[in-house]
Structures are given as structure tokens and as C-alpha cells.
Amino acid sequence: MEIFDYDNVLLLPRKCRVESRSECDASVTLGQRSFRLPVVPANMKTVVDEKICRWLASNGYFYVMHRFDLDNVQFVRDMHAAGCFASISLGVKQPDYDTVDRLVAEGLCPEYITIDIAHGHADTVKAMIAYLKQHLPQAFVIAGNVATPEAIIDLENWGADATKVGVGPGKVCITKLKTGFGTGGWQLSALKWCARVATKPIIADGGIRSHGDIAKSIRFGATMVMIGSLFAGHEESPGKTVEVDGEQFKEYYGSASDFNKGEYKHVEGKRILEPIKGRLADTLVEMEQDVQSSISYSGGRRLMDIRKVNYVILGGDNAGEHLLM
């Protein structure tokens, strides 16, 4: 198997068929809905909150709300009252089953439910998927996180409508250092490996450091790309604002960090400071334009045309072996 990551792969251009990148369609469909971009902010406390989720949903973007210190039932109720779709995260513990029971009792069904645990190839995830399919069959179920084709096959067979690929490649994730496991350093290879067996959408989660990495993720099989650090540190971001030597920063920390947990127990995340980047809306516009440019370089007009291009692995012997794959 080839081992590569975002920083040592480049996509090869094909003849351009548009006069302007604005002719390129960067939208993507996930479940019953289409979204302006194939990106979703990470479901982390320092990246999204209720206000940001409502804004994203109202403006044609996908979102997944985090599952920490939150009343999911009230969140679904509020989003539906605002005329927005609801997209929540669940774990696999008893309180998560209680949440499902409360949703059913109140006649509420979120459009999207993400089963979100660090090691998603697990019997506990199988049980939660089955419970969701039995009690909230209309919900689109995303399950993860995983790193192998075996995991993709199992999750799809268990009933997941989409899978989330990536174990520890994120900027504030230290899973590989703490455990010796993960996709840090080869996330893009892991995505390609998993996509070969997938029959349902994959969300590539983690390791994105630039907008060009979005196109690379699409090329190697992702339908959607989950991004943390690039979305953290905006004016609207929920992270605490910190001033260092006169410069403004926002806190950004991993979901399994002691900052998120409030205790130093089984820590697989760390805290960093992100320089404040300005407004989230401006970043999303820039992202959309960059993805449109990627589509134009691919010789296409639609997002999935990026999947047709060849690529080179930098530092390898030659480009030839990667042509027409």
C-alpha cells in the first residue's frame, strides 16, 4: 500500500473547460440535502456552538453540533423552531440512549446523527446504530471514527449511512503519541484505502491544514471533509479569547483533552492558541472560491470531477505509477 499524506501529494491539472471558476459547482449532497461546500466544521466545543450551527444551517452549509455540556433534545427543538435542520452528536453510553428515548417521546427526529467516539470500530457503536435505526429510522446516521477498510465494511453493514475516517491526525490530537495507533502522518492514504471498499459517503476527519487539502480529500474518496483548526479562531468561535504580546488568540483544544473533560483522565488531545482569523463567513467564501479553482484545474465543472485527475507523490521515484488510478 502506498503511504502518503496531504503534504507530499499534488494533483495534476487537466485541460480547463470553463472561462471562470465561478462556473464550477462546489456543492455536495449528503443524505436528503445539498450543501454549498464539502466541508463541515469539527464538532468540537472550541469550533461550533448553537449560534454558529444555526448560521451555517441557514446559509446552506452542513454542520455537526458537539455533544459536550449540551441538551441535545432542546437543541433539536430550537433548530427546528428556527426552520433549520438538526444535526447532533451522540456517544455510546447510557445518557446517549436516554437522549434517543427523549427525542422519540417528544416526537423529534434530528435529520443527522453522528455517533462520535475516538475508536468507532466497536460493538458499542454497532449497538447504538441498531438502536437509532429502530427508534429514529428517518435520521441519517454518520458513524466513526475509523481507519481501516474492515471498519468501513462493518459500519456500513451495521446500518451507518456514512462513515467518518481519521484516528488522531488532527492538529490538537495526540492519540498517536499516547497510544501508538492512528492515521496521523498517513491520513490521505487511509482515506484512499477505506474509500476502495466504501459504498456510502465518507467524511474525512482531521489533518486538513490548507484549502487545497479539501480537493485532495475529494480526489481520494471523501464526500465531505471535517475541519477543526482552520475553522477555530474566528471572531465568532466559542473558544476563549487570549491576548499574548498584544496579539489576540482563541483557545482550540481536542475533544479528548483535559481542557474539554475538565479533568486529567485519559487525555488524547491538547490545547493550542489560534490567531484570530476574522469572520467565519469570509473564510467560507474563500474556501468556496478555492474549491471552485480546484474543480477548474481538474478540467471539470462539478466537485466530483476532481476524482478523475492523476497525482504525484513527492519524493517518490516518478509520477507514472500514479497515472489513471
UniProtKB/Swiss-Prot annotation:
Q: Which SMART domains match?
A: IMPDH (SM01240)
A molecular function (GO) term: GMP reductase activity
Residues at the catalytic site: 173
Q: Among the record's GO biological process terms, what is one?
A: purine nucleotide metabolic process
Q: Which residues bind NADP(+)?
A: 202-225
InterPro entries, alphabetized:
Aldolase_TIM, GMP_reductase, GuaC_type_2, IMP_DH/GMP_Rdtase_CS, IMP_DH_GMPRt
CDD domains per record: IMPDH
Question: For this UniProt entry, what's an example GO CC term?
Answer: cytosol
Record has DNA-binding as a keyword: no
Catalytic activity annotation: IMP + NH4(+) + NADP(+) = GMP + NADPH + 2 H(+)
Q: Main EC class of this protein?
A: oxidoreductase
EC identifiers of the protein: 1.7.1.7
Alphabetically ordered keywords of this record: NADP, Oxidoreductase
User: What SUPFAM superfamilies does the record point to?
Assistant: Inosine monophosphate dehydrogenase (IMPDH)
Role this protein plays: Catalyzes the irreversible NADPH-dependent deamination of GMP to IMP. It functions in the conversion of nucleobase, nucleoside and nucleotide derivatives of G to A nucleotides, and in maintaining the intracellular balance of A and G nucleotides.
Indicate the family of this protein.
Belongs to the IMPDH/GMPR family. GuaC type 2 subfamily.
Which HAMAP family does the UniProt entry name for this protein? Answer: GMP_reduct_type2
PANTHER family xref list: GMP REDUCTASE
Please identify the protein, giving its name as recorded: GMP reductase
Q: Which organism is it from?
A: Paracidovorax citrulli (strain AAC00-1)
Which taxonomic lineage does the organism of this UniProt entry have?
Bacteria, Pseudomonadati, Pseudomonadota, Betaproteobacteria, Burkholderiales
Gene name for this UniProt entry: guaC
